[in-house]
C-alpha cells in the first residue's frame, strides 16, 4: 500500500503550497469532499519509484471547542490517525507561535513519526531559522521553502525512507501467486461486506461500526470458476482466526490506497438510495488512477419497476463519465447477478492489460482519420501519422503527427471511441497522448 503523509500546521504556514509541490498539482485526485473533508485535500505524489499519498489538512486549532475550527480539528485528527508519517509545518519568518506548541503537544501522543519542517526559510541562516523550534521537542527542524522547492526533495525522501521501512514487503512468490487484485469500494452500508461474503464463500464477514480504521493491509485470496483472485481490504477487514470482521466506516485514505493497489475496482452502489456526491467522488478516484472498473448496483431484488427505471436514469445522468464501464444490477444478499459481475471483472482486467500492436493501432488510426478528419485551426489541419502503445493498466495510446496541439477534445473522444470499438476495450479508462513532430528546417533561412 502507498504510504500516507499528513501535512499538519496552524493556518497560513504553507501547507497548501507544499501539497501542490509534492503532488505537482495536476496529480491531485480530488479536493474538498462535501460533508466529509472540510479543508482536507488528497493527492498523489512520487519520489523516484516510490509513490505516496498526501493529505493536506485545514489550519489546525487543536483546542477549538465548537464551530468550523472544531470541525477542522476533528478532520485533522482523523487524517493524522490514518497517516504513516506526519509533516508538521511551522513558519520560519514569523517564528514560534503558541498554536505550534499546542499542536506539538498533541502530535507527541499520536504514535506516528513526526517530521518538523520550518517553511519560508529561503534566504535565512539555518541556525537562526531553527533556534526557536527546538523547544517543541520534536527533534531537529528541517528548513525548506515550499514556494521555491528548497529542501523539499531531501525532506520527502527522508520521510519515505521511514514510511517504507515500516511496511512489510511481499515476497516475489507471494506476488506471483496473487490472482487479479480486486478492490470493492463504496460508501458505508451499500453491502460491501455481503458481497465479499458471497465471493469468498467459506469465510464469514461481520459488519459493525467502530471508530478508526485498521492500518494493516489484508489480502484475501479466493477462487471462482477455477480462476484465482485476490481481494484487497477496502471495508477495513480484520482477521480474527478464520473470521473477517468488516469495519463499515468510510475512509478516504483506505479507499484511495485500495484503488491504487487494485487491478480492477468494483464500485458498489445502493439501488435503494440516490446516487450521492460521495459515490461520484469515489468513481472519480478510480478514473484518475486509471483503474479498470465494474459498477455493481446492489439491493436490486424486490424493487418496484418504476423505481428501477428512475434509478437507471439517475445513474446515466450522474455517472455519465463512467460510460466505459459495465453496470450490473445485483443482490449480494440473494447472490443474484454475481456471475455476470465477475465475468465483467475478467473482461475489464483483460482490456486494461491488452497488448496493442503498433501496425493495428496505426491502421485503426488511419481508418478513423479517413472516416472523419480533425478540424482545421486557422490554416493548419492536424496530421495524425501513426500510433503505438505507451503503457498498460490503463492502456495508453501515443499518437504521433504534426500540429497535434490543435486537436479538439471532441475529436480526442471520437478517437477514443474508435479505439475502444476496434480493440474491445470495455471496462478500462483509456489514455491518449499526442506527440507532435518538429520540423528540422523550420528555423533555417
Swiss-Prot record:
Pfam families documented for this protein: KH_dom-like (PF14714), MMR_HSR1 (PF01926)
Domain (KH-like) ranges: 354-438
Residues of the EngA-type G domain: 3-167, 180-353
Gene Ontology annotations of biological process type: ribosome biogenesis
GO molecular function, one term: ribosome binding
CDD domains xrefs: EngA1, EngA2
InterPro entries: AAA+_ATPase, G_ENGA, GTP-bd, GTPase_Der, KH_dom-like, KH_dom-like_a/b, P-loop_NTPase, Small_GTP-bd
Keyword match Cell cycle: no
UniProt keyword annotations, A-Z: GTP-binding, Nucleotide-binding, Repeat, Ribosome biogenesis
Transmembrane residue ranges: none
Residues binding GTP 2: 186-193, 233-237, 298-301
Binding residue positions for GTP 1: 9-16, 56-60, 119-122
Quaternary structure and partners: Associates with the 50S ribosomal subunit.
Family stated for the protein in its record: Belongs to the TRAFAC class TrmE-Era-EngA-EngB-Septin-like GTPase superfamily. EngA (Der) GTPase family.
Function: GTPase that plays an essential role in the late steps of ribosome biogenesis.
Protein's name in the database: GTPase Der
Gene behind this protein: der
